[in-house]
Each structure stands twice: as C-alpha cells, then as structure tokens.
C-alpha cells in the first residue's frame, strides 16, 4: 500500500509524512517551473496559547515554507532541508501572516498572494469522517468553492495507512 510505504520512508528518513509529502510537492513544482526557490503556503492550527486551547473558533495562521534547489540537490538532502525549515517555522507560528507581509514588503499585486502562489494542506484525519462526542455528532461538510485563492492547492488526507489527495 502506497500510504504505508510513504510512512515507512518518512520514518527511515527521520521526517514526518507531512514533511515527505511537502518535499515531494516542492520537487514537482521545481521540476515543472525550473525555479531554484519554491515557496509554499501551509496552514497551521496556531493554538499555542493556553487560553485558546478550549475555544471553538478558527485560529489558523499561514506559514510560508521555502525549499532551495540546485543541480546537485539530492532528495534525502532536500528532506532534511524541509524538516529544518518546518521545525524552525514552528517557533514563529504565532507571527500573523499579515505582519510578515508588512515586514518583508514584497511587491504587491491583486492577481496573486504576496509571498506564495501555491498552498499545501495536510490533515491527519479521514476526509469527511464524522466525530462523535457525548451528546454531539460533528460531521465535515463538502464545500464547493467557486473561486481560487491560489494558483494551486494540494490537500492530502491521512487516515490510518490510507492516504488520499485532491488538487
């Protein structure tokens, strides 16, 4: 099974499945675009403060994770680069995306996001899987979006050994 094999590879390389899939996606983007720097937006739960842990609400922040490629970049080295980048980004997950944009002052355009045009979202639960709580049943609803926020969005869903994706 592909999901199990990818998890085993991630474990052998000392990375998470998220990191392995992100590195693979960034490699694909690099191969198609030829760009030596690939930046991908990644949503993060942003619930590091004790006072928000028990609140119901949308506290998601966006991080920008960059991978650098050259002619000699091996995939195992890229995995370690992505691991370092992801772990270092965790230390700054409380920095609001808007403040990051203000500090970096990139060239702005109404046609695209200022720091990245590709989003990657990995979820550790089954897609559409119902959640049961005492006296409460929660179920994910499919939401059709008529507009695209980014040029490309990859969503991956991990449930047990199963792995699914949508682009």
Say what each PLM segment does.
Residues 1-167:
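Adenylate-forming
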């Amino acid at each position: 099974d592909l999901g199990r094999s990818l998890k085993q590879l991630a474990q052998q390389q000392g990375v998470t499945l998220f990191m392995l899939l992100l590195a693979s996606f960034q490699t694909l983007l690099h191969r198609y675009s030829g760009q030596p720097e690939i930046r991908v937006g990644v949503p993060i739960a942003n619930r590091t403060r004790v006072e928000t842990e028990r609140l119901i609400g949308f506290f998601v922040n966006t991080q920008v994770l960059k991978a650098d490629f050259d002619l000699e970049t091996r995939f195992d080295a890229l995995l370690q680069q992505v691991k370092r980048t992801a772990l270092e980004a965790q230390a700054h997950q409380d920095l609001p995306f808007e403040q990051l944009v203000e500090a970096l002052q990139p060239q702005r355009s109404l046609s695209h996001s200022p720091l990245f045009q590709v989003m990657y979202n990995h979820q550790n639960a089954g897609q559409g899987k119902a959640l049961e709580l005492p006296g409460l049943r929660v179920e994910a609803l499919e939401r059709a979006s008529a507009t695209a926020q980014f040029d490309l969005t990859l969503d991956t869903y991990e449930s047990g050994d199963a792995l699914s994706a949508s682009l």
